[in-house]
Regions:
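Conserved helicase motor core of P-loop NTPases
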Residues: 359, 377-379, 467-606, 611-614, ...
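Structural detector for short beta-strands of small beta-barrel domains
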Residues: 1-16, 60, 624-625
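ASCE P-loop NTPase motor cores of helicases and related translocases
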Residues: 255, 278-434, 482-497, 504-531, ...
């Protein structure tokens, strides 16, 4: 419930000028908060300059701080007219360089009432004040205009019901044009301000008198619904009928009014005519996705058709393959040899396959043959004109470990500073041969960015597993490219990387084919299954952790992967449990409170966005090495120091949204990584998330041990459930170069299924009841999991 506190600012405890975050001590004169009988309260939030000793009213929510007790977390505020005494104190503060008490008093005396307004309207009067240099005078007016102008804007936005945090985002984006945009083009905020959404902009528009039937309202609703639908489904377009239905639902839920669908359809036609959205038949595209798909097509065709291709005869390539086999003591099968030949002889080549099928072996063979053909020593990796890239930092480091060649993220190679960066290099990537791994994670936007920066004279090897989860953002680029005959490809099927006792790779292959094997519940050397109800999963994980640690397995080697964040078996709850078990609070040990947890030294954390400037990327895992209170930092904010494999990075409090605990993490975030021990809890509570590629991706993250927890029905459902195929238009864009494109949908959704003769091998519903529930897990059971 929102409450207000009016009173005098007794002290400014903390302030960060870079993001306007402040902590104040307010002496209370009045409040409507029930049962609050203290005479002062801590006030926190984003606000422009405030003056000690002056009167303000703050609105917000009372929250409980673990260390400092009750605080007011503000949503908006208002200040009373400042007093002369308060202004003198404010002008002589550290906010304004070169102004002492005497000069500040002269300024107030010169301008009299409404001092700040008068200064901003008539700054020339400052020239007559002795002791105030031209440089300090200019800086004084500039700072005052910034702070007071910001406050005026915030106050106005607050009157429109926009919370302070969003108001600062709006002010930061539009600068001096803020009020003009807000008051005249409120729906522009939907496109420009991340996190604002349509509803807030629509409420603002209603405040400003924009009618519910206004054309600009319909257009904003259409554009917003289109983009949101693509982000939620992963599709790159929406059918016009579906878009109109979704938009009508949005518009009518935002304001209680019944609308004429034909009017909304008319505005969709307007958006198409004005190139605000794109249309192909009945398909409606967001502009960025439409042109990104078209870009992928045009750049791949450019590379395939226009570049120079060095000619290497097949006999020479085969001779070099034999040389490498002899030197490295390996033997390629015929399919692997053909893959090496095809990758060398083609400008663009796709290599795909599941875990253990030899993708890395083939990649190393391609690199070595390419080096020999160029007259280079393939053992001297630093001399090779080859660029290795991957969508995540962990995947890039893994490429480096497996090939010995330098590797980096796609973002880093392209000089992209963040996920939203759409900048291009001044020149193409400097490499004759570019190898990109984990391509199933590459979305439509990033694929376009990558291909547009590759020279027509470069070769590209695309590597990935199309049966894994597709990219988080729209598109299924790898899956689509695999159905374009113009691009040569090889799928590796035979499993090599598996000892006699290893079963994880075999299980993954069976899951990929939609088979839950009859021995799924049986104890194996490298995997175990425990039938556990959702509510008992935390206690089971606690037992498993204890057993693992007693058997000498380092905590850092154990990773819990889960489908959802919420619930008793969700990521958030498991993270809290594992933090308390593996890194419990210590007496007199510093910890920092964040919205979802308390951070402690030695905590395992994950970075959630791409930050090329600090060389940390989405999915990177690190450990907290230090916690530094704000009074000791340059930013004046509490800072968390995290070590990412030797790269130490400091996170001030306003950047903590980029990290979270990672004892447990989402299956999506685990892509591109491998862990010695994976614990995978799957229950019906996460049914809406369960799909075959989700379980397959999770299982393939386990390197040595896989512990499956949960309900057998949930695992079976996930194995059988393919999920909804993403709707994309990438394959059709190659239609002028291909035949039989109309078979796309059948090709994309084609899956390998088991025959009726295999029924005895599959665990069926009839067999479920024959499996005893793991009501209690004994120490012997647990010891067997990790026994050596």
């Amino acid at each position: 419930m929102e409450v207000y506190f009016s009173g005098t600012i007794e002290r400014i405890i903390f302030e960060n000028p870079s993001n306007f975050y402040r902590i104040l001590l307010l002496e209370i004169d009045d409040t409507d908060a029930e049962d609050f009988d203290d005479f002062e309260i801590i006030v926190t939030g984003t606000m422009a300059d405030v003056i000690e000793g002056e009167d303000y009213t703050f609105w917000g929510q009372i929250v409980q701080h673990s260390k400092y007790g009750e605080q007011l977390q503000i949503s908006r505020y208002d200040r009373a007219k400042p007093t002369s005494k308060g202004l003198v104190k404010y002008f002589s503060s550290s906010h304004f360089k070169g102004i002492g008490l005497k000069t500040a008093q002269k300024i107030v005396d010169t301008y009299g009432e409404n001092t700040i307004d008068e200064i901003l309207q008539h700054p020339e009067k400052l020239e007559g004040i002795t002791g105030l240099s031209a440089k300090n005078r200019e800086a004084f007016v500039s700072t005052l205009r910034l702070n007071y102008g910001t406050e005026m804007v915030l106050s106005k936005l607050a009157n429109y019901g926009i919370p302070n945090k969003l108001a600062f985002q709006i002010q930061d984006f539009y600068k001096e044009e803020t009020l003009d945009v807000v008051e005249n083009y409120p729906y522009q905020l939907v496109e420009d301000i991340k996190g604002l959404g349509f509803t807030i902009a629509d409420q603002l528009a209603e405040e400003l008198g924009i009618e519910s039937q206004a054309p600009e309202r319909f257009r904003a609703g259409l554009v917003h619904s289109l983009f949101q639908a693509c982000m939620e489904t992963g599709d790159t377009y929406v059918e016009a009928r579906d878009l109109l239905e979704q938009t009508l639902t949005l518009l009518e839920s935002s304001r209680p009014v019944e609308l004429d669908p034909s009017q909304v359809a008319q505005e969709l036609s307007y958006l198409i005519e004005e190139d605000k959205v794109q249309q192909i038949d009945t398909k409606i595209f967001d502009n960025s996705l439409f042109f990104a798909e078209e870009g992928i097509r045009s750049h791949l065709v450019r590379i395939l058709e226009k570049g120079k291709q060095k000619s290497h005869d097949l006999e020479t390539i085969q001779k070099h393959i034999t040389t490498i086999e002899e030197e490295l003591g390996i033997e390629y099968d015929n399919i692997q040899k053909q893959a090496i030949c095809d990758a060398i002889q083609n400008k663009v080549f796709i290599l795909t396959g599941g875990p253990g099928t030899g993708k890395t072996t083939v990649i190393n063979g391609i690199i070595a043959v390419y080096a020999l053909l160029e007259g280079l020593d393939f053992r001297k990796k630093s001399n090779l004109p080859i660029l290795l890239a991957a969508p995540t930092g962990r995947a890039a480091r893994r490429m480096n470990e497996l090939t010995g060649l330098p590797s980096a993220t796609i973002h880093r190679h392209l000089g992209m500073t963040g996920d939203d960066d759409t900048s291009h290099l001044e020149d193409y990537l400097d490499a004759e041969f570019i190898i990109v791994d984990e391509f199933s994670m590459v979305d439509t936007w990033l694929a376009n960015q990558l291909f547009s920066n590759i020279s027509s004279n470069s070769k590209i090897l695309i590597v990935g597993d199309s049966d894994q989860l597709p990219s988080v953002s729209p598109g299924q680029v790898l899956a689509d490219l695999l159905h374009i005959p113009l691009i040569p490809q090889t799928r590796l099927e035979k499993i090599y990387r598996q000892s006699k006792e290893s079963t994880i790779v075999t299980l993954a292959s069976q899951i990929r084919q939609g088979i839950l094997p009859a021995d799924f519940t049986q104890k194996k050397a490298d995997r175990s299954y425990f039938k556990i109800a959702s509510g008992h999963i935390p206690a089971t994980i606690e037992k498993i952790l204890g057993a693992a640690l007693r058997n000498g397995i380092p905590a850092r080697d154990i990773q819990v992967l889960a489908p959802m964040y919420r619930g008793t078996a969700g990521i958030d709850a498991i993270n809290q449990l594992m933090q308390d078990l593996l890194n419990p609070p210590q007496k007199d040990q510093l910890s920092f409170e964040a919205p979802q947890c308390h951070y402690r030294k030695r905590d395992k954390v994950i970075h959630l966005v791409n930050d090329a400037e600090i060389n940390v990327f989405n999915g990177d895992l690190g450990a907290i090495t230090d916690l530094i209170p704000g009074k000791y930092t340059e930013s004046k904010q509490d800072e968390i120091v995290i070590d990412f494999d030797g790269n130490e990075v400091s996170y001030p409090r306003n950047e903590w949204y980029k990290i979270r605990l990672a004892y447990a993490m989402s299956i999506h975030k685990s892509q591109g990584s491998e862990f010695p021990v994976v614990i995978l809890p799957i229950t019906s509570a996460s049914r809406r998330m369960l799909e075959r590629n989700l379980i397959y991706t999770a299982i393939t993250r386990a390197k040595s041990k896989l512990i499956l927890l949960g309900e057998l029905q949930a695992f079976d459902y996930a194995t059988q459930h393919i999920g909804t195929a993403r709707k994309t238009y990438l394959i059709e864009r190659f239609s002028d170069l291909l035949e039989n494109v109309e078979e796309k949908q059948q090709a994309v959704s084609e899956t390998v299924t088991s025959s009726a003769s295999e029924q005895s091998y599959i665990l069926t519903e009839e067999n479920w009841d024959r499996i005893p529930a793991m009501i209690g897990i004994t120490d012997t059971d647990l010891k067997e999991i990790f026994g050596k």
